[in-house]
Amino acid sequence: MPTRARTLFLLATLSAACGGGPTSPGGGPSATPTPPGSPVSGFLFYDENSNGIADGGELVRLPSVGVSIGGQTGTTTTGGRFSLPSVPNGAQTAQARAETLPAYFTSPGVSVSVPPGGDVPVPARLALGARVRPNVYLAFGDSITFGTGSSDEEGYVDDLRAQLRSFWGRADMVNDGEPATRSSAGEARIAGSLGQSRAAYALILYGTNDWNEPECRSEFPCYTVDALRSMVQDTRSAGAHPIVGTIPPVNPNYADRNATERNDWVRRMNDLIRQMAAQERAQVAEVHGDFLKQPSLPALFDDFLHPNDQGYALMSQSFFRAITQPLPGAAATMDDAGPILFVPPGTRP
């Protein structure tokens, strides 16, 4: 190759290696143009039958959950609604962010063309057994679950129902509190209770009465944690989801009933219950921790063991948070199913 031709070839090669190409009027490389975007609004709904369509009877909406479309994210508000001001035009996937979904929910995503021409319904799913009734909650435990000590004898159940209906739009409660029972009795009867109620969630609160068993004091932790683990597993076998309540403390004003010793036993047992729940990937309602955060523990009790109305209201908040908030350490993985096709309002596939 002649010397001049070789020189020109080398200069061209160096120019390409150093980023030679389109330049801006000022001499530098031109910026990649930002794709045009459009506003997108919609809502996050509980897709009870997993068909990807917001059917007329599917009334539950999920507030306080992150939604992502085309790399743009927002958080749902009342009624599960979201609004993103500028989403890149074209084919995108709309999906709830897994780490923000309530415990046990998943989001398969929905394919949507931007601009969509209407509200985008984004589905969230909850895997349930074939006979299980969506939005039904089984309160399962002893006399504290039964409601002893509350003025209406309903305990936390009515208040929790009202909170869930206000937040999500639908909830029904079944109370199966059996006074004076221990966790071993709960283990024996939970399968039958779930079979009869066909509940989607079991709100398990057991262990208070185990203290009365000499074995549970002398051979700690006796059968309590194993019985609770069995209840968690039986709940899943029934196609439902477990919420495990930590054991509430007792009223410290009853010193003549070994309140200090008993509350230490409760604290140690709850440490093991939390560990078990983490191993089983079960959501925890932090009843014990929420009680201890209050300025006056005795003010929450009707007697030595049973909460009063104020205490039960606090318990309903503990269970409400457990149901509606993410599972600790929720993985960022979504449902294995790929994106489903967004069907515009008023049409069906």
Question: Predicted segment positions?
Answer:
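Serine-esterase "nucleophile elbow" of acetyl-processing enzymes
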Residues: 126-177, 191-198
